[in-house]
A protein has these predicted regions:
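N-terminal secretory signal peptides that target proteins for export/translocation
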Residues: 1-11
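Bacterial N-terminal signal peptides
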Residues: 11-24
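Flexible, small-residue-rich N-terminal segments that precede or flank a structured functional core
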Residues: 28-79, 160, 164, 209-213, ...
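Beta-strand-rich interaction/scaffold domains
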Residues: 35, 98-192
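A short beta-strand element within beta-rich, extracytoplasmic domains
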Residues: 73, 84-97, 233
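Extended, low-complexity, turn-rich repeat/linker tracts enriched in Gly/Pro/Ser/Thr and Asp/Glu
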Residues: 93-103, 211-213
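Ser/Thr/Pro-rich, low-complexity mucin-like regions
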Residues: 183-227, 237
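Short, composition-biased motifs enriched in small/polar/acidic residues
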Residues: 238-312
Length: 312
């Protein structure tokens, strides 16, 4: 009898890939990521870009012009497919406020719904660095997600088309300091992006009070030499659930899962590794109130059978 579990993307399942072998014990892990790309959208100069600057701008300036910032993180490169996201924090650092006065406001992170490119432009005018420089092909601008090829639905992006209608998280932002976003919405976003990397277009950072002047802020970008002021995504996750022990006893196959408190576990089987055949529940351990190993058993047969462990 051959037993296989193979890695599978976009699920919270782990498939065992061994012949009566041992796999790694599931545990909670944490990783901190810096952006893989970030950029500023500049209403006053809608065809300019600023992807190479050491800051991001968001909010309404004293002159009534809006800036919005974009940032994305390569989650799939840092977290194993099939992991369960349990907590998310996003940290941003305000590095500058308006010179002539400032107003505190609620800032939000909204999931971006279409691809965009960072670009590498630096300010063209040192006297007005926030205006960026004429966009190069592919740069994110106020009018384009990718200059010359992919326009926003409306300049600055349209809610519910270019970016989510509701925010994933929000926090009040005032003076020069570090600020944190957290909450269930961010967990949902990151889980989605881990399970479906092609949908990971990151977040838009914007004030929710775009009619209030002096809410503009500069935030550290990924280009800063001091990464301590760059945006950070802190991910706490459970690696894919695995079957930690497989052995034969009393003419039965025994498959053990290390179960964590507060999650439901099951072991399932079917006759083929791929395809659309339904999985049959071998043992449903239900919600775990006392953590520790749980073992499912299955009679030995002459036919191949495939098993997976599932955590909800």
């Amino acid at each position: 009898m051959t037993v296989f579990f193979l890695p599978r993307r976009a699920t919270h399942f782990a498939w065992l890939g061994c012949f009566l072998g041992l796999l790694t014990l599931a545990r909670a892990d944490q990783v901190t990521l810096f952006p893989s790309a970030d950029a500023t959208l500049i209403e006053l100069k809608p065809t300019n870009s600023l992807g190479g600057a050491t800051w991001l701008a968001a909010g309404l300036t004293q002159n009534g012009n809006t800036n919005r910032a974009l940032m994305k993180f390569d989650i799939a490169a840092a977290v194993s497919a099939g992991s369960t996201i349990v907590d998310i924090g996003v940290r941003v650092s305000v590095t500058r406020t308006p010179v002539d006065g400032n107003a505190d406001s609620l800032f939000s992170l909204r999931r971006v719904l279409r691809p965009w490119n960072e670009g590498s432009n630096l300010p063209a005018d040192s006297q007005y660095p926030g205006l960026g420089a004429p966009a190069q092909l592919g740069d994110a601008t106020w009018t384009h997600a990718s200059w010359g090829t992919n326009a926003w639905t409306i300049p600055g992006g349209q809610e519910d088309v270019d970016y989510a209608a509701g925010f994933s998280a929000s926090t009040g932002i005032g003076g020069i300091a570090d600020y944190f976003f957290e909450g269930a919405g961010l967990i949902t976003d990151v889980q989605l992006w881990l399970d479906h990397p092609a949908q990971n277009f990151g977040w838009m950072l914007k004030t929710e009070e775009e009619k209030s002047i002096f809410t503009a802020r500069r935030f550290g970008s990924r280009e800063l030499e001091d990464a301590g002021e760059s945006p950070q995504l802190i991910i706490t996750y459970l690696p894919p659930v695995v079957i930690t022990n497989v052995h034969i006893a009393s003419n039965r196959l025994h498959l053990t899962v290390d179960a964590l408190l507060g999650y439901s576990y099951a072991v399932e089987s079917r006759a083929t590794a791929a395809g659309t055949n339904a999985w049959t529940t071998l043992t449903n351990f239900g919600l775990i109130f006392s953590p520790g190993p749980r073992t499912a058993t299955d009679p030995l047969t002459n036919s191949a059978r495939f098993y997976r462990a599932r955590r909800n």
